[in-house]
């Protein structure tokens, strides 16, 4: 089954060219089945790029997916056209009475700020509490995952002396987890962050289980059964050239930045990077959607009851 998105959303053409099945709302209605309703709370400045990345992953399963784009109500983006935001996004305050089978909370380039100093922190806390009554399963990504694990468990983020930047090998710590079904013993994941969550603090929190971790860059994927959530601190959703774009941006700005490790062949930025994470990215998000499909009530209004 395809992903259901507006025909004029940029992701529609991108995914169609890539061979992902997409359909507009009129086509979806003719199938007469209940799609999984997935929300994307997009906190990234490059909204369209992020939409494409997540739509690609959640649209590649046999399930029909209805993707809803959500923004913070009071925060105004400066990097995406107002027309795009008005056409395709709904503010959280307008959708808070609705139910979702799944919600993705993206990262945001605000790691240097304490959580309480983020301008929309109060509303984001409201969102996270709202997931406990209105969302069947929530996936917090990078800063979004850090915010969730801090909000629900008090686990702190810590600044790194140098940016964790590159593609790092991670170990499969929970081969029996349904979220890691089909995973190899090790996988490579893009990492791009100035902060870390520490395994000792995750272990000290009640009800958390680390599923993927790295000796070099620490815990990556954490399951929180009590809050029906997954937290991932790295970037399976990244395109092949996302790390290159970040590196080139910082070089052009004169910022001190190391070449992303294990990304370019022989760590040579003059060569085209290799994508070594795509298959595991599809596995993880496909497994997440499968778990939602198996557990979510058919009557979406029954979520949270």
Curated annotation (Swiss-Prot):
Known EC number: 2.3.1.31
Annotated site (Important for substrate specificity): 192
Localization terms from the record: Cytoplasm
GO terms for MF: homoserine O-acetyltransferase activity; homoserine O-succinyltransferase activity
UniProt-annotated binding residues for substrate: 163, 192, 249
Record field: catalytic activity: L-homoserine + acetyl-CoA = O-acetyl-L-homoserine + CoA
Cellular component, GO, one term: cytoplasm
Active site residues per record: 142 (acyl-thioester intermediate), 235 (proton acceptor), 237
The keyword Cytoplasm belongs to this UniProt entry's keyword annotation: yes
Keywords noted in UniProt: Acyltransferase, Amino-acid biosynthesis, Cytoplasm, Methionine biosynthesis, Transferase
Site features described as Important for acyl-CoA specificity, chain residue numbers: 111
Entries under Pfam families matching the protein: HTS
Pathway noted in the entry: Amino-acid biosynthesis; L-methionine biosynthesis via de novo pathway; O-acetyl-L-homoserine from L-homoserine: step 1/1
GO BP: L-methionine biosynthetic process from homoserine via O-succinyl-L-homoserine and cystathionine
PANTHER family: HOMOSERINE O-SUCCINYLTRANSFERASE
Protein family: Belongs to the MetA family.
Function: Transfers an acetyl group from acetyl-CoA to L-homoserine, forming acetyl-L-homoserine.
Protein name: Homoserine O-acetyltransferase
Origin organism lineage: Bacteria, Pseudomonadati, Pseudomonadota, Alphaproteobacteria, Rhodobacterales
